[in-house]
């Protein structure tokens, strides 16, 4: 199948959802996209932060799982995103939570506002497009163990896993910054 990736001519970066590497495409040109049976091609536009929870059998079960983030950097090394959280059941929401994400200068910032208390922890953060080896990784100034950090220099992917113990009160219980 052929497709065009918008914005390539102006420096927009796209990442393959599955292998998390930057797409090699030319501006204004059809790019062949592999789409065998059973595979849906999905791409992430650089400059986006995507919150995730594990897909489970029910909404209620999913609501009780840890959070993960994928930050896909643009060519300037930045990204933004927003997460809206409520109880998932009420028709009229009395308490909600809005979390803003910003990546700038080798740091991911999360800032929440609202009255809804989401107690699910943050498990993992994946940053796509990290062009150089990260330094010490910290969450709110506390060192993340080296065993929890991996960097793929070829794919330019930074993965930070096992953050549950550092976010036991809930991923969005307080504002935080992850630096690398």
What are these regions (language model features)?
Residues 105-109, 122, 153-158, 175:
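A generic structural signal for beta-strand entry/edge sites
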Residues 1-134:
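Catalytic core of carbohydrate-active enzymes
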Residues 125-133, 143-144, 163, 172-173, ...:
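C-terminal accessory domains/tails appended to large, multi-domain proteins
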Residues 140-171:
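Extracellular/luminal ectodomains and secreted, surface-exposed scaffolds of diverse proteins
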Residues 43-45, 101, 149, 170, ...:
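Short beta-strand element of the conserved SAM-dependent methyltransferase core
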Residues 25-30, 166-173:
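Solvent-exposed, conformationally flexible loop/turn segments
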């Amino acid at each position: 199948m052929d497709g065009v990736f918008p914005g390539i001519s102006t420096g927009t970066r796209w990442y393959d959802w599955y292998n998390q590497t930057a797409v090699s495409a030319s501006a204004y040109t059809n790019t062949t996209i592999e789409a065998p049976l059973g595979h849906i091609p999905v791409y992430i536009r650089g400059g986006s932060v995507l919150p995730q929870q594990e897909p489970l059998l029910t909404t209620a079960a999913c609501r009780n799982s840890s959070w993960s983030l994928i930050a896909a950097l643009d060519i300037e090394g930045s990204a933004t995103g927003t997460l809206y959280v409520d109880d998932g059941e009420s028709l009229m929401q009395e308490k909600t939570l809005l979390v803003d994400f910003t990546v700038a200068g080798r740091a991911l910032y999360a800032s929440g506002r609202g009255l809804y208390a989401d107690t699910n922890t943050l498990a993992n953060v994946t940053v796509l497009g990290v062009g150089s080896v990260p330094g010490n990784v910290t969450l709110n100034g506390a060192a993340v163990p080296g065993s929890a950090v991996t960097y793929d220099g070829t794919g330019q992917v930074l993965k930070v896993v096992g953050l549950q113990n550092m976010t036991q009160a809930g991923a969005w219980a307080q504002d935080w910054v992850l630096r690398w």
